């Protein structure tokens, strides 16, 4: 990603910190990019997926992500235990709160893929596949 907002961190008073890419160390910024996500994609990986999606840098395929949109601090208690307190939340560059919702893919995919007789995914060869993939459109934004 060249330049652009990566994430907003919003605290309970409504203060919004902006984290941006400066474009200085960009690698392959104009090459096609596809990101595969699922319900195991959480926290920092959700931030990355949301930033790439909202900045139109990548096409996101898969299932909605986990939805870990809160930032917590743990405070030590005198008995040795700790108390986790939510102190802020993440917003994507489009100001989407991902907590409990996740990043919604541009192109949904099923949780499992049909396979051919050799055990390989048959999605790209079968135009009627439930995968909803089209090889010619795979990298279009």
Locations of regions flagged by a protein language model:
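C-terminal "post-core" interaction segments
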Residues: 1-141
């Amino acid at each position: 990603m060249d330049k652009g907002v990566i994430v907003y961190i919003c605290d309970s008073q409504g203060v919004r910190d902006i984290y941006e890419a400066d474009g200085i160390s960009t690698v392959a910024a104009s090459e096609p990019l596809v990101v595969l996500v699922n319900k195991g994609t959480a926290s920092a990986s959700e931030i990355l997926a949301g930033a790439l999606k909202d900045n139109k840098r990548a096409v996101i395929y898969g299932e909605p992500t986990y939805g870990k949109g809160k930032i917590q601090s743990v405070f030590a208690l005198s008995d040795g235990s700790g108390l986790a307190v939510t102190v802020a939340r993440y917003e994507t560059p489009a100001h989407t709160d991902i907590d409990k919702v996740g990043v919604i893919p541009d192109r949904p995919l099923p949780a499992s893929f049909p396979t051919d007789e050799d055990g390989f995914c048959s999605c790209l060869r079968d135009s009627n596949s439930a995968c909803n993939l089209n090889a010619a459109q795979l990298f279009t934004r």
